Amino acid sequence: MKGTPSFGKINKSHTHIRCRRCGRNAYNVSKHYCAACGFGKTKKIRRYSWQNKKVNGVRIR
């Protein structure tokens, strides 16, 4: 069978598993890198200024 009924079979397996470095469920199995910390893609930890926000809405470093 092909077409629309077959698309339901695609998402049975897990896209992301637990990352060895950061511990979050963000390691892409097929692309071999972590979407959260960048493990597998770079040695440096993936970090952006827009990532973390305090409860009162102010950004923290």
From Swiss-Prot:
Binds to the 23S rRNA. Belongs to the eukaryotic ribosomal protein eL37 family. Binds 1 zinc ion per subunit. InterPro entries: Ribosomal_eL37 (IPR001569), Ribosomal_eL37/eL43 (IPR011331), Ribosomal_eL37_CS (IPR018267), Ribosomal_zn-bd (IPR011332). The keyword Cytoplasm does not apply. SUPFAM superfamilies: Zn-binding ribosomal proteins. HAMAP family: Ribosomal_eL37. This is Large ribosomal subunit protein eL37.
